[in-house]
Amino acid sequence: KGKGASMLIIGAVLMFVCHMIFAITPEQYFTPVVAYGAIVILGVSFSLVPAALWPSVPKLVENRYLGSAYSVIFWIQNIGLMTFPILIGWALSATNQGVANPTDYNYTVPMLIFAGLGVLAFIFGIMLKIEDKKKGYGLELPNIKK
């Protein structure tokens, strides 16, 4: 019930954990169970964040700006969808010089980039929670009040 900012923080931590599992697990310990477990963690993260994010927008933005707020969120998301494949491609090219077969690439750096995004999301989640406590937006309160 409620806990929007907390769910964002938990989702960010889970995203970090998942990508660090992919980045630093030694090859001899990287079994299908580990891989599937990391993907399940990522799935939970990807479920928590939108479930908390979208219902929180009306708590932060006046009703008359709500449509614009959602459009800005989609705009920023689409910028990320456009730029991050380029960034990851550049990172793969820079760290796998001389590797002809893409299935032989080392994906550690891209996973660390994604883990870093999890850290950034965690920091922003903490900042959001602090701001919510100061200004009383109600991000930690349920949307439906009895």
List where the protein language model places each region.
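Helix-to-loop junctions at the C-terminal end of transmembrane segments
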Residues: K1-K3, L92
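Juxtamembrane/transmembrane-helix interface segments of polytopic membrane transporters
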Residues: F22-P26, P85-Q97, K129, K133
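Multi-pass alpha-helical transporter architecture, strongest
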Residues: A23, Y107-K146
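A membrane-interface helix-boundary motif in multi-pass transporters
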Residues: W90-G118
